[in-house]
Amino acid sequence: IFIECTRDGINLIDNNIIWNVEGRFDPKKIPVEPGSTGWYKMEEHDVVNGYGIYGEGTDHLRIVNNLIGNCRSAGYFAKPVSFRAEGMNRGGTSVDAELINNIFYHCEEAAIKMPTKANKAEGNCYVKEEGGYLRILYPQPPVCLHLPAWQEFYGFDLQGQEAWFDVDVDTEKLT
């Protein structure tokens, strides 16, 4: 789900199954990074995507009661579009997003990639997610956390949980 530079009111994404999000990119254009060199990059390569929900400059986004899984990159990713302004308007900040009571399942890079800590996450369940799956990208360097650190350092997901079980969604039969 892509929502772009919405600045007015609240936008709600609720009660969805978002599954097997591979993204649109040419895998041949992704450079091979030996060893841990990719761990120290300050930003993502521009050809990789695969976000379950992608907020581009959208403020006041509410993401509630969704099952988001098997995403190539992240279940939720947002970035500001600071210079997308016309006339007397401002750019999009991607702040005041609230991710509430969602299940994030085995997203390859991260369950959540928030642009800043000016957002909220509460009551989410993270299933089959591995190290550094909760991220705040700015100010740089990004922080890559697990649930206990997310709770301790940012006060996010105090009612959140981690779990390890299998989910199988039949995308043909929608079951």
Model-predicted regions and their roles:
Residues 1-174:
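Glycine- and acidic/polar-rich repeat regions and solenoidal domains
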